Amino acid sequence: DWSSDVCSSDLAGHVANRITIVNMKKPTHEEWLQWATENNISRPLRAWAAMTPKAFKSYLDPDQTDNPYIFKPSSTAKSFVSPRSLAKASPIVEKRHKYSENALTVALAGTVGESAAKSIATFISVEHNMIKFTDVLADPMNVKVPEDIATQVMMILEAVDTLSSHDDLNKYMQFVKRMKSSEIQSIFFTMMFRNKPKIARYNTEINNWATENIGIM
C-alpha cells in the first residue's frame, strides 16, 4: 500500500494538500511472478516467491503481526520484502557464484531483510539437485523426480522459461504429473497460462490436467 509503506502520513499538511494520495493494493505473489518472469528476475527468487505468498501481504491485512518478511511501522528494520526490494535482490542472486555463502546472505539481508535472506538461501542451496531440462524431456516418465519441494519449483520455473512447443510441453507435463504435490502442479499450470499462453491454451495435456483438477484451481 503506497500510502502506508511510503509513510505519506508523515507529510506536512500543506505538502499533502498539493498531491493526490491513492491507496494501491500490493501485487499478489502470482501477479508478481508473472511480471518477474517477463522481466528476467532470478529464478531462485521467483521460486521463493512462488512458495512464500505471505511475503506479499501488507501489515494492513489481518493477522500479519508475526509475518517476518513485510514492512511494519512498529519495526525498526530498514530492509524488508517488497516487489521493489525483491527485484533489487535479483542482480545479487545472479552473481551468487562470486559471493561466499555468508556474504551472499548478508547482501540479501540488507536488501530484503534477514528472515527472507535465510529462506531464499535455502532455495539457492538446492540448485545443484535440479534435473537437467533436456533429461526430463528425454525420459519424462522415468527420470527421477526430486523429493525436495524447492528443487521442484526451481525446475518448473526453468521449464516455463524454456518451453516453446506443444510436443515439449506434453513431455514435461508427464513429468509434472508425477510430482506428488498438487500445489506444485498448480503453480506450473498457472505460470504456463500467464507466461506462455500461446502454447498452453490449446495443449491437450494442460487442458486434461485442468479438467481433472478443477477443484484446486
Ranges and model annotations:
Residues 33:
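Compact nucleic-acid interaction/catalytic patches
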Residues 1-8:
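Short, small-residue-biased leader/transition segments that mark boundaries at the very start
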Residues 9-30:
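A short helix-turn-beta junction within AAA+ P-loop NTPase domains corresponding to the substrate/partner-engaging
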Residues 101-168:
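Accessory nucleic acid-recognition modules appended to NTPase machines
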Residues 89-96, 124, 160, 192:
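Generic structural signal for hydrophobic core residues of well-folded globular domains
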Residues 145-217:
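Terminal-proximal interaction/regulatory segments of ATP-powered molecular machines
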